[in-house]
Amino acid sequence: MKGSASESPSASVAEATTTDVQVTPTALLQLDREQIRKAVEVISNRSKSKKNNNELLLSGSENLFLMVILWKIPEKELRVKVPLPHSILSESSDVCLFTKDEFDSPEQTEGFYKKLLKKHGVNTISQIIPFKTLKTEYKAYEAKLRLLGSFEVFITDARIRRHLPSHIGRHFYQRKKVPVSVNLLAKNLSKEINRCITGTVLNISKRGSCSTIRIGHTGMETEHIVDNILAVSEMLSEKLPEKWQSVKLLFLKTEKSVSLPIFSSFVTSQDENAVSLRSLRKQELKKRKRENAKLKKESKMLRKKSKKATSLLTQSGLASSAPAKSPGAQKKKTNKAHKKQKVTEECEEAIPQLVPIGETPDKENVKMQENITGKTPKSKSDPSTPKGKKRKALLATETPEASAPGTSGKKQKKDVQEFRKPEASSFSTPRKSGKKASNTPRDKKTKAAHSN
């Protein structure tokens, strides 16, 4: 019983470790060491063949870089110092150190730091440049390019590192020779400097998904280069936001060579039955598309419902407003029709009857006018007082008594009275014509005398 109890925890631990490896795969499990060795041998053989053809031009060794391609562009820049098991510096490589201005003159500061390095036993640094000399002597563009080409590695004091980008220029960042910060006040200074020189810097920018890391040179042994690549890949699996799952592709190359593939997340050599990240991402994309389609359908339904509601409201508003306005409109139309009929009847029947001067109309004539027009005759207004707009009066035709047979045989023209559309408020009686036939007894006598 005790033996079984003692064996059970170990078995559970083993199961837990296997499940952890399956869930979160590390770089050592995913990478193939033989594939990396083959790629390193191909690149080193190519560089050696170039040296044999051009011995004078290519005397030194070429730098090797590991190109990392991520699935996603990171939101923040990542800069990590990666310690390597084997130094990436060659025997002929030079190291430059940028220091703080401890004294007024740059010569005094240079001598001070040389003594400090000798005290700690550091012999790898070839030149010391104070910050004051960097600002004055290397201000020109050509001087910066000369400085960049003369050294392989640049180290700077951590106290002045934030001031360097404005003075060294963009070419240091393009050539991947960014100065590495060192704490010159550390107690074990030799160990600190050797760690910076032998190691490399992991720079992953947020501008793109591709970045390169220096991992050695062609003069190194193949096994040493393979060890450095594995160390960098382990650091990637720890420092990246999604660990090793964020790595898409890994390539090995020099500055001017073709990139050779080392790792691909689509097909891995160790886990053949494992689900690839590509399929997982396709599933995620399908889910997102389904969710987006559902949201679109819901939005369309809501829009249709809102349109229906607005149309119903408009229809109900029109239906409620139509019966309220219809009786008034009908009344107005009927009133206008009645008024038009009255105006036409008055225009046709408002021609006044001629009455001889001096004779007042009798009651019978008044009754006759009332029967014809349906209104009592109004009293004449004074011509001096204008009532509204003036109306043109028709010339009344002469009576058969006034027209003498011997005066003229021509037919007398009948002037037609023009009526304007009367206003609804009041109707003025038309004025009589200016030329009137006189029917007085005196005139009759004169006419009879002429006829005789």
From Swiss-Prot:
Q: Where is this protein found?
A: Nucleus, Nucleolus
Q: Which BP terms does GO give this entry? A: regulation of apoptotic process; regulation of cellular senescence; regulation of protein localization
UniProt lists compositionally biased (Polar residues) regions at: 309-319, 425-440
Instruction: Give the UniProt entry's GO cellular component terms.
Output: chromosome; cilium; cytosol; nucleolus
Modified positions (Phosphothreonine) in chain numbering: 334, 344, 360, 399, 407, 429
Q: Give the similarity note.
A: Belongs to the universal ribosomal protein uL1 family. Highly divergent.
Q: How does it assemble?
A: Interacts with ING1. Interacts with KPNA7 and KPNA2.
The name of this protein is Ribosomal L1 domain-containing protein 1
Q: Which organism is it from?
A: Mus musculus (Mouse)
Gene transcribed to yield this protein:
Rsl1d1
